[in-house]
Amino acid sequence: QPWIPFV
């Protein structure tokens, strides 16, 4: 799964 940064 693609990595989504927590912003």
Swiss-Prot record:
The answer to keyword rRNA-binding applying to this record is: no
Q: Which UniProt keywords apply?
A: Amidation, Amphibian defense peptide, Pyrrolidone carboxylic acid, Secreted
Cell compartment(s), UniProt? Secreted
The modified positions for Pyrrolidone carboxylic acid read Q1
Residue numbers bearing the Valine amide modification: V7
Q: In which tissues is it expressed?
A: Expressed by the skin dorsal glands.
Q: Which GO terms describe its biological process?
A: defense response; positive regulation of smooth muscle contraction
Top-rank taxon, per record: Eukaryota
Q: What is its main location?
A: secreted
Q: Which GO terms describe its cellular component?
A: extracellular region
Task of the protein: Induces contraction of intestinal smooth muscle in isolated guinea pig ileum.
Family according to the record: Belongs to the frog skin active peptide (FSAP) family. Peroniin subfamily.
- What's the protein called, per UniProt? Peroniin-1.2
